[in-house]
From Swiss-Prot:
UniProt protein name: Probable ganciclovir kinase
Gene3D superfamilies membership: Transferase(Phosphotransferase) domain 1
Binding site for ATP: L201, G202, V203, G204, A205, Y206, G207, K208, V209, K218
Sorted UniProt keywords: ATP-binding, Early protein, Kinase, Nucleotide-binding, Transferase
Protein's organism: Human herpesvirus 6A (strain Uganda-1102)
Gene of this entry: U69
The protein's enzyme class: transferase
Pfam families documented for this protein: UL97
Comp. bias intervals (Polar residues): 1-16
Length: 562
């Protein structure tokens, strides 16, 4: 390593920094052992040959209406096989879900007692729950019986080629289930990447990524595979994709087009480079870059406003590009290892696995600020809230806009780093050494600490990161930085966090003296003189003005939008 850039993981890079070392799953007071992961739901209109555009209803997918009204399905208790599968003459798509049993409460079915009250079914559910160590209170446990309805027709797997979301209605609520087909041919070809001489692209706390003939192969643990499959199914259905769609890029989101739940392997496609490694910035191509940023912002909006999913790990290392020299042709947002469904959908989601004919529950969302984002790209408001309550949770108020804006604020941190590289007259490498090295060192400090075991040290590390973010922000928006600084200072003062307040002040003042604006002045002036450069800076400024929880209600639909 020749330039000594240290990443937020404490790794030497060329000069690449990977996402921070994920902290091991931690025990939460009152939660099941190892609970951290979560996920859940929203809507879509009735299934036809393809899922149509999404609405704003309260389920991930809307119920499938069936014209076959007189049949009642009896289920094989092992996995709920539909006894009249062969005789059923419903239309191709309508027969995917098994008639009125999907729309009625389980307790209204003639065979409800046999199916849902049987010890075998209860034991099976309890076994699934226990195997995943998911915390469920009694009410949640009781409602899980409705998941039995999702399994009444295994022929769904014959109609899809990739994970796909379907809705299941009970009398009182709707459940969202992603069906995950098992492709034996792909399994045999890709599920042992070490033996096929696949090239290692990356290694992280959640698994490895390999490249084999432009196919990205991700090996992960069970939880990460469940998340990958569930989110892929939600995105595919909410986008209106055809049931047989095998696309892995939808609305600038990179998703798995095949997930082997047996080997915990997900497949997608490879890209030239990630955004952190991209060094060919040229301020003259700002229109190209602004267009790319707009597409990525739209991806964040789709993920939150339509799919009800927070990404929670937006960073340059999770944005992949194809480019030729300084021109970026396409970019995608990827990696859902930290993603969570909006918590108002807790307890309503699962995946149905073809390979073992079983259900896998999707863990619930906790929305803990300390579990969100790479500390080096965490939104100002999230770091500020950690200083008040290290293990505090984000209150989205059941408002998708608030969740969306939180992700967009992290996206703003990414764009800020790009602008500093773009405008530094010394070049990208020097910009990384000068503007990013200290930020990464401070972020490393937070990454290495467990907030439950060392809450005060973790809080102080996040406080220093927050101060450094404001320092870097002041390089571009020096007229606004005083207002932002004072707003954060007053927030800590009013909450009685005097130690954090003083550390924030001292770090900001000290680091401001060490940071020169001179290297970017010429490039920044060039950026301001162009139409798209001015738009970029305006939109970036507006996102950074979201620095309190109240600001998360702002309408940001016009920002980074072509």
């Amino acid at each position: 390593m020749d330039n000594g850039v240290e990443t937020p993981q404490g790794q030497k890079t060329q000069p690449i920094n990977l996402p921070p070392v994920r902290k091991k799953l931690r025990k939460h007071e009152g939660l099941g052992k190892g609970v951290k992961r979560k996920l859940f739901a929203e809507d879509s209109s009735p299934l036809k040959k393809q899922i149509s555009a999404c609405s704003d209803m309260e389920t991930l997918s809307s119920p499938v209406k069936s014209e076959c009204e007189s049949r009642s399905a009896s289920l094989d208790e092992s996995f709920g096989k539909c006894k009249h599968e062969i005789a059923c003459d419903c239309s191709a798509i309508e027969e995917l879900l098994c008639h009125e049993s999907l729309l009625d409460s389980p307790m209204k079915l003639s065979n409800a007692h046999t199916i849902f009250s049987s010890n075998k079914w209860k034991l099976e559910l309890e076994k699934i729950i226990a195997s995943k160590q998911i915390f469920l209170d009694m009410s949640e446990n009781a409602e899980l019986a409705a998941y039995g309805e999702t399994l009444c027709n295994l022929r769904i797997f014959e109609k899809i080629s990739s994970p796909f979301l379907f809705d299941v209605q009970s009398e009182e609520r709707s459940y969202s289930v992603v069906y995950v087909p098992h492709n034996k041919e792909l399994c045999g070809q890709f599920c042992q990447p070490e033996k096929t001489m696949a090239r290692v692209l990356g290694v992280g706390a959640y698994g490895k990524v390999f490249d084999l003939d432009k196919v990205a192969i991700k090996t992960a643990n069970e939880d990460e595979s469940v998340i990958s499959a569930f989110i892929a199914g939600v995105i595919r259905a909410k986008s209106g994709a055809d049931l047989l769609s095998h696309e892995c890029v939808i609305n600038n989101l990179l998703i798995s087009n095949s997930v082997c739940m047996s080997h915990k392997v997900s497949l997608s496609r490879t890209y030239d480079i990630d955004l952190h490694k991209f060094e060919d910035w040229d301020v003259r191509n700002v229109m190209n870059y602004y267009s790319v940023f707009c597409k990525l912002a739209d991806a964040v909006r789709f993920l939150n406003l339509k799919c009800r999913i927070n990404h929670f790990d937006i960073s340059p290392m999770n944005i992949f590009l194809n480019h030729k020299k300084e021109i970026i042709f396409d970019a995608v947002l990827a990696d859902y290892s930290l993603s969570e469904m909006h918590p108002n959908y807790n307890g309503t989601c699962a995946i149905a696995k073809e390979y073992d004919k079983n259900l896998q529950l999707v863990p619930i969302s906790r929305n803990k600020f300390c579990d969100m984002f790479n500390p080096g790209f965490r939104p100002l408001v999230a770091n500020a809230m950690i200083l008040v309550n290290v293990c505090g949770a984000f209150d989205g108020e059941n408002n998708p806009l608030r969740h969306c804006n939180l992700d967009l604020c992290a996206f703003a941190q990414v764009v800020l780093s790009c602008v500093l590289r773009m405008t530094d007259k010394r070049g990208c490498r020097e910009a990384q050494l000068y503007y990013e090295k200290r930020l990464f060192a401070l972020a490393n400090e937070a990454c290495r600490l467990n907030p439950l075991k060392y809450p005060f040290a973790y809080r102080d590390a996040c406080c220093k990161v927050l101060a450094e973010h404001v320092v870097l922000l002041g390089l571009l928006f020096y007229r606004d930085v005083v207002e932002i600084y004072e707003k954060l200072y007053d927030f800590l003062d009013e909450r009685g966090e005097f130690g954090s307040r003083d550390l924030f002040e001292a770090t900001f003042l000290n680091n401001s003296k060490l940071t020169r604006r001179q290297p970017i002045r010429e490039g920044l002036a060039s950026l301001q003189s162009s139409e798209y450069g001015e738009k970029l800076l305006h939109d970036l400024r507006e996102l950074f003005l979201i620095n309190s929880t109240a600001d998360l209600d702002k309408d940001t639909s016009s920002l980074f939008h072509m």
